[in-house]
Amino acid sequence: MLKRSIFILIILSGFVSKAQTLDEQIGYLLSDALFYSDKYIVPATDAAVYQASSSWMNSAKKKEKWQFDLGVHANVFFVPNRDRKFAISNSDFQFFEIEGANEATVPTALGNDNQVYLVGDLDGQEIRFKTPEGINQETVVYPYLQASLGLPYGFEVVGRYSTRTKLKRGDYQVYGFGLKHNFSQYFSALESKKINLSFMTMYSNEEISFEFLDVDTDFGNLGLNQFTSKVDTYHFQLAVSKDIQAFEIIGSFIANVSNFNYRVSGNSSEASVFESAINQLLPQLEDTKWNYMGELTGVYHFSKFFAKTSFTFGKFVNLNIGINYTIN
């Protein structure tokens, strides 16, 4: 009887040990996925904030009451080399290893299409996949519509909307609204010299998605096919401008604060093994960030139209061009 009890205990302890080992392996896999997600997606979400910060203010001048502008804009973001790639080594991972190497350089979401294989063993089954590609674009261009309406007392309301812009490995969309107030109206000395002073605050929502990892295992699909980031950003802009005949030259200082939210999703036609688990871990990557940038804008008025070009600079460089029509 004693021998039988000991035998049963040995069998049960084996099952418990195996379960603990499998749980540990899954934990290591999720930890590695979180590490890679951070390095891969954060440069793109930081860039999205800069794109959404550009060219909100059409003029630092006081807008006439009920005057309405409607414009078509194109935003051009220049992807810096430093944010296109990152280095990994086997010491960075607990579950995976780089196939055939100890170190490698891989693309971020903003990078090229170079790939390496990562391999791991989950309960005796090999998991092997290529690292995700980047968008492989040196510039990111997206169009959007922007409208503004003059309100009483030197206020102006602005709205912005872009359709979902397709990237090579994902898509991007932004919308938002803002409120501007002109302060130079209170200083006759500034107005007499055609110098304008305004402050504007804006809210924007940016959503950026990328193809991430499509990995099938005996346990099902990992459920990491798409990586999506939603960013809520509040912008604050102080602008000074000078009128020179039909031109207005605007210089601005912009500060913004952003809250980041991340989510992965799988292929709905297949079972997703780790989708829920990794989504529970992704809040560890979420952060609140402040950014500061400068902006130079040139505006040229002709008839009821005006053309505008804005150059935003700081951590990133962004160019914005637009043509607007004014309805008095």
Report each predicted region and the residues it spans.
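Repeated loop/turn-to-beta-strand initiation elements of outer-membrane beta-barrel proteins
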Residues: G154-V157, Y186-A189, A246-I249, F302-T309, ...
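Short loop/turn motifs that connect adjacent beta-strands in outer-membrane beta-barrel proteins
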Residues: N58-W66, N81, R169, S184-L197, ...
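Bacterial Sec-dependent N-terminal signal peptides
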Residues: M1-E24
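Transmembrane beta-strands of outer-membrane beta-barrel pores
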Residues: A74-F78, Y161-T165, F183, T201-E207, ...
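Residues on the lipid-exposed face of transmembrane beta-strands in outer-membrane beta-barrel proteins
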Residues: S59-K61, L70-V72, L145-L151, F177-F183, ...
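Outer-membrane beta-barrel biogenesis signature
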Residues: A19-L118, S192
